[in-house]
Amino acid sequence: MAAVAAVAARRRRSWASLVLAFLGVCLGITLAVDRSNFKTCEESSFCKRQRSIRPGLSPYRALLDSLQLGPDSLTVHLIHEVTKVLLVLELQGLQKNMTRFRIDELEPRRPRYRVPDVLVADPPIARLSVSGRDENSVELTMAEGPYKIILTARPFRLDLLEDRSLLLSVNARGLLEFEHQRAPRVSQGSKDPAEGDGAQPEETPRDGDKPEETQGKAEKDEPGAWEETFKTHSDSKPYGPMSVGLDFSLPGMEHVYGIPEHADNLRLKVTEGGEPYRLYNLDVFQYELYNPMALYGSVPVLLAHNPHRDLGIFWLNAAETWVDISSNTAGKTLFGKMMDYLQGSGETPQTDVRWMSETGIIDVFLLLGPSISDVFRQYASLTGTQALPPLFSLGYHQSRWNYRDEADVLEVDQGFDDHNLPCDVIWLDIEHADGKRYFTWDPSRFPQPRTMLERLASKRRKLVAIVDPHIKVDSGYRVHEELRNLGLYVKTRDGSDYEGWCWPGSAGYPDFTNPTMRAWWANMFSYDNYEGSAPNLFVWNDMNEPSVFNGPEVTMLKDAQHYGGWEHRDVHNIYGLYVHMATADGLRQRSGGMERPFVLARAFFAGSQRFGAVWTGDNTAEWDHLKISIPMCLSLGLVGLSFCGADVGGFFKNPEPELLVRWYQMGAYQPFFRAHAHLDTGRREPWLLPSQHNDIIRDALGQRYSLLPFWYTLLYQAHREGIPVMRPLWVQYPQDVTTFNIDDQYLLGDALLVHPVSDSGAHGVQVYLPGQGEVWYDIQSYQKHHGPQTLYLPVTLSSIPVFQRGGTIVPRWMRVRRSSECMKDDPITLFVALSPQGTAQGELFLDDGHTFNYQTRQEFLLRRFSFSGNTLVSSSADPEGHFETPIWIERVVIIGAGKPAAVVLQTKGSPESRLSFQHDPETSVLVLRKPGINVASDWSIHLR
């Protein structure tokens, strides 16, 4: 959905002129992103204050006499040498090669927000012990692994080592800045603090404060500390400045990734002299590319990679956050006392990372790898893995704003059948609801929604309807009345219901940080409450940043009040996660906990992967937007959000046929595959294109559906282990420096390499095939190429450059039907691509495709296929799973094989049987026809 500047084009109903006039005055109407509507660091007072602090000796000192070491953690006080304010550092060793530390005020005037509901559990502890000590430092040893932590007292600093190698330093540049809470000055005292949890700022210093010592530079209240104005919006700050900042130094690291969401390259850029990367969930109309502006979601996780090591930093803070990246060269002289702990000589490259958040505490997890797969598992152990989606959601989704009415929906449904195109889901945008009242249907356009859903169900198709988290203020609207009467809306500073302007006009915003609100919302998806809904109706949560058309930066006022007395500034980036969570819970509960939900959300945070899919938002029908979808989804996958996609064709503008074809080809090889379009664009259903383009799109859809068993297995692996589905090349080839900057091609699992064509009029692409000693097979021609090399590959409009790695086995369905549900019992064909050593392996996950029985009743199959010594073996990769299925093995295609004299099938309890085969000597492809064995059975095929 588009934001403020899209309103002029989007509103065609009676209130359109009011919205347009109002928003035109407030924010201005433009044809692209208006940067003036969004803050720079200079315009964000806390970012400006934090960034004004330059590297140097830290004013903080650790009071080693206060150190206490317990079974779960170490605590020590930190003192600011100027203000004499005390902080407390809590340090924990964690199992699985992780460390956590938290810094908070020792005696806060008011508790600071600690982010709940992101961690799936309290991480298990690996005890710390003191292994050395002198007058200015303490050496700690972790119970797991060869790790030591050096706590230096003056200036305060942490260094984390593996054996005698320095991995990471904290506050090495002296940029720790913790704005402690204080009483407002007399000149600032005219404003009363907001009603919250009852804690009121005092008007006099705390006991022990020394006024003459609190008037130094660190105590000066700079502009914006107690009140801030941006454009026409005033932000009261009743609790004063409360920002936190800290630096991390990563010696040996030159390549860092993560901290999505940004429309930028995969590798993070140095931000010195420019804008930091911003993490603040915002509805950005027609966002620009290749800059660090905030977008719809925020995941405060940064990954660092070199050929020998991977590390992660997880900054658990839900407030507005800025991240500075700088490049350095660290010689031994930089480390001072750390000389004693370092080996080698000379200088080493270094990346420095600086985090700055408006409120909250400093809560950091250090993920120590050592490999990137270890980092993925470590992060997944903290925040959970990608939810296993229902099979249908991996098919093709047809959407636009908006399908007009029931007849239009059913015509689109029939169009896919008439043109022999597969499709699983049709989508409805905001116009389907009665006056933008969510959980309702427009009675003139959708008078019989259940009948429409039944018609789709008869075709084994689904419907997704939008349910946004803003509620029309209307006394006759049951949803609004209940929320108001129950007191479940976000409040203003004075305690009244917060109202903003969005699609329905004046709207209330449910307080999803309140567990009672989330339970109420989940209950709204029951079939009784959501009238006209049915089991094949699923949900789209748009605008959940939250988007407020007349709010500052198109979002909510920061001094709005949430459950527990917290301000919106404390919880902003987690709001969208809570919407996603409550909706997914609702879809799960409506089936009695049996059915897996499908929910697409635009805003997200760390942990959102547990609740469904995300997409890259309101993109544009331009070639650069096609290109940028690759690094955007790769970045999301690196931080756990594997189920990602981009609007095929671009949301804004009308794509030329070539661009639309190329987008379908790319979308077919990205996890979430949905075409979507703006209200004012032309209709884009594939059959409306000239026949030559329609045929190419049909082929792209066919490739997607053929690979559904492979996609489903990849999503299960992401769900089980936390590894991304769509991977940068360096994840699989961590020592190949050439791969570290590549973001125009990617891997699906470890088997397929995809290089989409993303340039207009392209006649060829440069494909990098990685891996010393690897071979790669073109999946269409079976031509073999050796790695590592850069290959020029000629392309036509019908080309999708995809290669299968030698050494992998990919399962496919070869009969493309109208939807995935129509294919789920079809036989499997195995594509076995042999390595130079004549080996290959792969997996296949199967279950019923839609319930939680794979979890609750162990009803699933995970089969492992292995080829070596001219023998293909099928065995169980997880003996705990059991699932009866009619699926059988129809064919085996072995790529890179010689011609055997005979092929023999062996199954337990049955005599050997010979299989017919066909061999093509030009392509070295051997096809084994109709082994006819159930996919759940153990068997072996021998080439003799």
From Swiss-Prot:
Record's GO cellular component terms: endoplasmic reticulum; endoplasmic reticulum lumen; extracellular exosome; glucosidase II complex; Golgi apparatus; intracellular membrane-bounded organelle; melanosome; membrane
Annotated region (Disordered), positions in chain: 181-238
Nucleus among keywords: no
Effect caused by changing H785N: Found in a patient affected by polycystic liver disease; uncertain significance; the patient carried additional PKHD1 variant; the mutation results in significantly reduced alpha-glucosidase activity
Bias (Basic and acidic residues) ranges: 203-236
A GO molecular-function descriptor: carbohydrate binding
Tissue expression as described in the entry: Detected in placenta. Isoform 1 and isoform 2 are expressed in the kidney and liver.
UniProt keyword terms in alphabetical order: Disease variant, Disulfide bond, Endoplasmic reticulum, Glycoprotein, Glycosidase, Golgi apparatus, Hydrolase, Phosphoprotein, Signal
Hydrolase recorded as keyword: yes
Subcellular location(s) of the protein: Endoplasmic reticulum; Golgi apparatus; Melanosome
Inhibition and activation profile: Inhibited by deoxynojirimycin.
Catalytic activity: N(4)-(alpha-D-Glc-(1->3)-alpha-D-Man-(1->2)-alpha-D-Man-(1->2)-alpha-D-Man-(1->3)-[alpha-D-Man-(1->2)-alpha-D-Man-(1->3)-[alpha-D-Man-(1->2)-alpha-D-Man-(1->6)]-alpha-D-Man-(1->6)]-beta-D-Man-(1->4)-beta-D-GlcNAc-(1->4)-beta-D-GlcNAc)-L-asparaginyl-[protein] + H2O = N(4)-(alpha-D-Man-(1->2)-alpha-D-Man-(1->2)-alpha-D-Man-(1->3)-[alpha-D-Man-(1->2)-alpha-D-Man-(1->3)-[alpha-D-Man-(1->2)-alpha-D-Man-(1->6)]-alpha-D-Man-(1->6)]-beta-D-Man-(1->4)-beta-D-GlcNAc-(1->4)-beta-D-GlcNAc)-L-asparaginyl-[protein] (N-glucan mannose isomer 9A1,2,3B1,2,3) + beta-D-glucose; N(4)-(alpha-D-Glc-(1->3)-alpha-D-Glc-(1->3)-alpha-D-Man-(1->2)-alpha-D-Man-(1->2)-alpha-D-Man-(1->3)-[alpha-D-Man-(1->2)-alpha-D-Man-(1->3)-[alpha-D-Man-(1->2)-alpha-D-Man-(1->6)]-alpha-D-Man-(1->6)]-beta-D-Man-(1->4)-beta-D-GlcNAc-(1->4)-beta-D-GlcNAc)-L-asparaginyl-[protein] + H2O = N(4)-(alpha-D-Glc-(1->3)-alpha-D-Man-(1->2)-alpha-D-Man-(1->2)-alpha-D-Man-(1->3)-[alpha-D-Man-(1->2)-alpha-D-Man-(1->3)-[alpha-D-Man-(1->2)-alpha-D-Man-(1->6)]-alpha-D-Man-(1->6)]-beta-D-Man-(1->4)-beta-D-GlcNAc-(1->4)-beta-D-GlcNAc)-L-asparaginyl-[protein] + beta-D-glucose
Effect of R400L: In PKD3; fails to promote PKD1 and PKD2 localization to the cell surface
Disulfide bonds: C41-C47, C633-C644
Family classification: Belongs to the glycosyl hydrolase 31 family.
Quaternary organization: Heterodimer of a catalytic alpha subunit (GANAB) and a beta subunit (PRKCSH). Binds glycosylated PTPRC.
Connected disease: Polycystic kidney disease 3 with or without polycystic liver disease: A form of polycystic kidney disease, a disorder characterized by progressive formation and enlargement of cysts in both kidneys, typically leading to end-stage renal disease in adult life. Cysts also occur in other organs, particularly the liver. PKD3 inheritance is autosomal dominant. GANAB variations may act as a disease modifier in autosomal dominant polycystic liver disease in patients who have causative mutations in other genes, such as PKHD1 or ALG8.
PANTHER family: ALPHA-GLUCOSIDASE (PTHR22762), NEUTRAL ALPHA-GLUCOSIDASE AB (PTHR22762:SF162)
Record-given protein name: Neutral alpha-glucosidase AB
Annotated source species: Homo sapiens
